[in-house]
């Protein structure tokens, strides 16, 4: 138990160092020509704030290309009404999904194919993301300043209700386990973190890696794309997007269970075992009177507090960190079972 507590304490210290080193985009202008790419499938209920924020971007020369990927809820008509003939915007109809492709990579590849050939940077945005007016310019400017090929500013994650137990684990995971400054310069694919909610990619690097065609069957296509870039000599990583973007991925616990279910089966079993050993076993031991277990629990909570304070997350939820990790492991187990049964789907498409 003392070893587990010591490792958890070391990881909390690592998260603290990462939090201090995490790059922060600043409000500025960008000189590159940019294509902002927005894939949509049945997003009529949430796309309006995202779209209005994109149309209000400042400090950057951009075009906005929107793909309606077979929506059945009027998404395309709503988008056309909202853009109201804005010359910066093109709205496309998605083509049928080819064999061997998943929906998100196919939509993104179509968007890139339709982007202006003069665009130097591709910025992918999800429909549940609302950007600050300077977000695109600040992202592209930092991409250039870092002389890197992919930059993913991690948005602030709004987490209502019970989703607060799991959603903050996104930022906590890479702050805790990934050496960020090393990862952003390393070409080792294993040192990769990215988030397709907001992601800027240098077009030359994207093309060299094979684009989304190189990750056409990947459920976690954002991280897979960065790994493909690294395998072809590029670099990239994450930065703090708290002041640039906010996203609310799920409105309820049931939505979160379905959403996480489509991808958590990809987590290796050894990873889940390590998480349980480090963050679930010590607090259980603490309840049985173990001082080392109590220290291990405190270390886990400390790491979560560091992450929450750095990324605008809920600090009080950090106290329930063992519950959060246990729930993550259960969700991963459910996802694995559904994947084995061939029962996973997302927005009407099998995964």
Provide a role label for each language-model segment.
Residues 52-61:
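Short, acidic, metal-binding catalytic loop of nucleotide-sugar glycosyltransferases
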Residues 32-35, 63:
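Cell-envelope/extracellular polymer assembly enzymes that use nucleotide-activated donors
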Residues 1-30, 168-171, 176-180, 321, ...:
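N-terminal membrane-anchoring/stem segments of glycan-assembly enzymes
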Residues 68-78, 95-96:
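A conserved acidic beta->alpha catalytic loop
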Residues 143-146, 150-174, 204-207, 212-271, ...:
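Catalytic donor/gating beta->alpha subdomain of glycosyltransferases that bind UDP-sugars
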Residues 108, 122:
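Short aromatic/hydrophobic "clamp" motif used to bind/position activated sugar donors
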Residues 74, 125-142:
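Acidic donor-binding/catalytic loop of UDP-sugar-dependent glycosyltransferases
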Residues 273-343:
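Membrane-embedded multi-pass helical conduit in multi-pass membrane proteins
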């Amino acid at each position: 138990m003392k070893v587990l507590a010591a490792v958890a304490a070391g990881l909390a210290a690592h998260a603290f160092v990462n939090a201090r080193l995490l790059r922060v985009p600043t409000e500025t202008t960008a000189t590159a020509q940019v294509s902002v790419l927005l894939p949509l499938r049945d997003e009529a209920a949430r796309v309006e704030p995202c779209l209005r924020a994109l149309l209000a971007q400042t400090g950057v020369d951009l075009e906005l290309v929107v793909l309606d990927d077979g929506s059945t809820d009027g998404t395309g008509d709503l988008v056309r009404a909202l853009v109201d003939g804005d010359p910066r915007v093109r709205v496309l109809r998605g083509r049928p999904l080819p064999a061997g492709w998943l929906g998100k990579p196919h939509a993104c590849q179509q968007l890139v194919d339709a982007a202006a050939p003069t665009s130097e940077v591709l910025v992918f945005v999800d429909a549940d993301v609302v950007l600050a007016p300077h977000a695109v310019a600040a992202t592209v400017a930092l991409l250039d300043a870092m002389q890197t090929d992919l930059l993913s500013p991690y948005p602030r994650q709004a987490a209502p209700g019970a989703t607060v137990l799991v959603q903050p684990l996104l930022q906590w995971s890479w702050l805790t386990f990934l050496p960020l400054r090393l990862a952003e310069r390393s070409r080792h694919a294993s040192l990769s973190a990215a988030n397709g909610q907001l992601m800027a990619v240098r077009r030359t690097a994207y093309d060299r890696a094979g684009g989304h065609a190189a990750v056409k069957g990947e459920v976690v296509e954002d991280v897979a794309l960065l790994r493909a870039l690294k395998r072809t000599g590029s670099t990239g990583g994450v930065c703090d997007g708290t002041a640039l973007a906010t996203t609310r991925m799920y409105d309820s616990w049931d939505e979160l269970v379905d959403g996480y279910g489509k991808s958590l089966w990809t987590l290796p079993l050894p990873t889940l075992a390590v998480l349980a050993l480090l963050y679930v076993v010590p607090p259980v031991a603490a309840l049985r009177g173990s001082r080392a277990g109590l220290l291990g629990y405190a270390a886990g909570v400390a790491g979560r507090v560091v992450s929450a304070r750095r990324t605008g997350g809920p600090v009080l939820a950090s106290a329930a960190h063992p519950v959060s990790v246990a729930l993550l492991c259960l969700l991963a187990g459910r996802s694995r079972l559904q994947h084995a049964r061939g029962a996973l789907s997302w927005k009407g498409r099998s995964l």
